[in-house]
Amino acid sequence: MKVTVISGSSSEVVELPSNAGLTDLKKVYKPRVDIHRKSFKILRSGGDKNDKSAYITLDAKRALTEQGVKDGSEVVYKDLGPQVGYRTVFVVEYAGPLAIMLAYAARPSFIYGSSIVKEYCYTQKLYIALFCAHFIKRELETFFVHKFSHPTMPRRNIIKNCVYYWTFALGIGYALCSPYYTEPASPTLVNASAVAMVIFELLNFAVHVQLSGMRKGDGDATRPVPKGILFSLVSCPNYLFEILSWVAFSLGTSMLTSWGFTFAGLVQMAEWAVKKHKNYIKTDPSVRNKKAMLPFLL
């Protein structure tokens, strides 16, 4: 079949087999351009060409004919710009905080001056270790647990994500490793918060393993509604346990920078959770009976 590809003010006719998929179209049109940069849309049946919302993005999991593309159809091409792999973004953004904290902890004299450096107190040692363990866990999950439905994201996202994580890591690391750091007055609070953080990290890991098991592998875009005790109150317990872990860290260290990171994470994860919760409701209306991220609240 012949399909006309519209790109701005120009157009080009490409020939495809009748059972072609989106990948076939991407390979034929502008073959020198990376296929991950290419996006194609088709006008919904009866839609207005001047209405952007009337266009449907073609899905790589379905044949083009199943999505309304036939001989003589027109599709609209968009260059998504330079792309970078999802896994690469995660590895880089999580490696930064780990490297920053280790640099602070290993060479405090370079940061604070050799004349005022003193031995770390118990709380500092404990929470430096927990901070590093958290991001080591994230790196291991990125390599061995997470399965990404999309292969790439815009390259600019790696800068945005790194600025977020690395900036907070600079603030948290500077305060936690500082010779002027004052640990909480209650050793019980310090230890109880550390235990709580470990528990929440393990629960977060358990959720990630369950979610990973629901997908066949990278590129699998199916989103079945997760079930089980961890999902009994909220749709996204991984975000809940992530936030609770940082609440525990903040309580145990009593640092404003940590509370700032926790609050920023809460805002962002709440947005993601609400979006996922709404998608789950479309699949299973009974999901309305629970909240998105915070039990009984949100």
UniProtKB/Swiss-Prot annotation:
Cellular component terms per the entry's GO annotation: cytoplasm; glycosome; mitochondrial outer membrane
Keyword annotations of the record: Fatty acid biosynthesis, Fatty acid metabolism, Lipid biosynthesis, Lipid metabolism, Membrane, Oxidoreductase, Transmembrane, Transmembrane helix
Membrane-crossing residue ranges in chain numbering: 162-182, 189-209, 229-249, 254-274
PROSITE patterns: S5A_REDUCTASE
Disruption phenotype: RNAi-mediated knockdown in tsetse fly procyclic form parasites results in growth defects in low-lipid medium and reduced fatty acid synthesis.
GO MF, any single term: oxidoreductase activity
Main location: membrane
Membrane topology designation: Multi-pass membrane protein
Subcellular location: Membrane
One Pfam family this sequence matches: Steroid_dh
EC number: 1.3.1.-
Domain of life: Eukaryota
Entry keyword Lipid metabolism: yes
GO biological process: very long-chain fatty acid biosynthetic process
Metabolic or biological pathway: Lipid metabolism; fatty acid biosynthesis
Role summary: Involved in the synthesis of fatty acids.
The family this protein is said to belong to: Belongs to the steroid 5-alpha reductase family.
Protein name as annotated: Putative enoyl-CoA reductase
Organism: Trypanosoma brucei brucei (strain 927/4 GUTat10.1)
Lineage per the UniProt record: Eukaryota, Discoba, Euglenozoa, Kinetoplastea, Metakinetoplastina
Underlying gene: ENCR
